[in-house]
Design a protein with these regions (language model features):
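Phosphate-binding/switch region of NTP-binding enzymes
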Residues: 92-174
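Conserved inter-motif catalytic segment of the P-loop NTP-binding fold
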Residues: 3-101
Length: 174
């Protein structure tokens, strides 16, 4: 709210956000553009197009923007979609490489444009270690490209047996 000209470019892969939800949370929908994305390649292409258009503007005329990807963990690859359509049961071993390449390019463009980006992702438990740890899905590309990594977890806050809210725990990893 401190900058009424600022906006958010929201890449949405879960089909979980609607315009009404945005309005219900008190967010001006005129300041938010939602792009539905299905694959890593589609996200990469759309994000690069947005950043290229932004960089074409005179720096003094640029309105502040922020990019958001919700959720990286839900993005498929074109190979995975093609394999599924063909009835193949093979795992897509190219996903981590495609993600790493996408964020290698995006990180440079985001830095040049001075545009922050927030990415949500899933975590999983690393099996086989003496002290179990959480790891982000999708390979190491995002881990190395990120300026900050914050793990969020939640548990229900109860009053007796009635759930009255959530307790959110934040752990800064990087």
């Amino acid at each position: 709210d401190s900058n009424p000209d600022a906006g958010v470019i929201y890449f949405e892969s879960e089909s979980a956000i609607t315009k009404q939800m945005v309005i219900d949370r008190g967010i001006d929908p005129q300041r938010m553009v939602m792009f539905p994305v299905t694959t890593v390649q589609e996200f990469r292409t759309q994000a690069i197009k947005v950043l290229d258009k932004y960089l074409e503007q005179n720096e003094a005329d640029r309105k502040p923007i922020m990019l958001c990807l919700d959720s990286m963990g839900m993005l498929s690859t074109t190979k995975e979609i093609d394999d599924t359509a063909d009835g193949k049961e093979t795992r897509d071993m190219t996903r981590a490489q495609v993600l790493k390449a996408a964020f290698r390019v995006l990180t440079l463009k985001l830095g040049r444009a001075k545009v922050p980006m927030v990415v949500t992702n899933h975590t999983y438990d690393v099996v086989g270690s003496m002290f179990p740890t959480k790891e982000m899905g999708g390979g190491s590309g995002l881990k190395y490209a990120a300026s900050s990594i914050v793990d969020l977890s939640k548990k229900k806050e109860k009053d007796g047996t009635e759930v009255i809210g959530n307790i959110v725990h934040c752990k800064n990893h990087k």
